[in-house]
């Protein structure tokens, strides 16, 4: 397990990068990204759903609450990224897939 300082640095960096990707995709996407107090939220225009991204320091994971599911991403030192152990998806890839599923739009791309 990575130490707390490294976790905070890497999770802040990963969530900031994701936030910037979400901002770039907002115009065509039907959603809006918003960050408050270290928590990143994705709000959908229809108001029916919300994705919540939070760093969980005690367990050194980034958690995503989306599509009635909790996703717990762990730090992968080799990949230098937070990955979902079950699928191997990194934070950006998983978020892109979840957005596509929520909006039923396979064209959504996070860059």
Please name every model-derived segment:
Residues 1-111:
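N-terminal intrinsically disordered, cationic/polar leader segments
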């Amino acid at each position: 397990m990575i130490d707390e300082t490294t976790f905070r640095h890497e999770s802040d960096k990963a969530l900031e990068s994701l936030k910037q990707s979400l901002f770039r995709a907002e115009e065509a996407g039907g959603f809006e990204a918003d960050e408050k107090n270290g928590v990143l939220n994705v709000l959908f225009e229809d108001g029916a759903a919300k994705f919540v991204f939070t760093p969980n320091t005690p367990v050194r994971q980034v958690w995503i609450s989306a599509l009635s599911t909790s996703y717990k991403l762990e730090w992968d030192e080799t990949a230098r990224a937070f990955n979902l152990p079950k699928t191997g998806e990194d934070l950006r890839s998983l978020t892109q897939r979840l957005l596509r599923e929520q909006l039923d739009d396979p064209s959504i791309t996070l860059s």
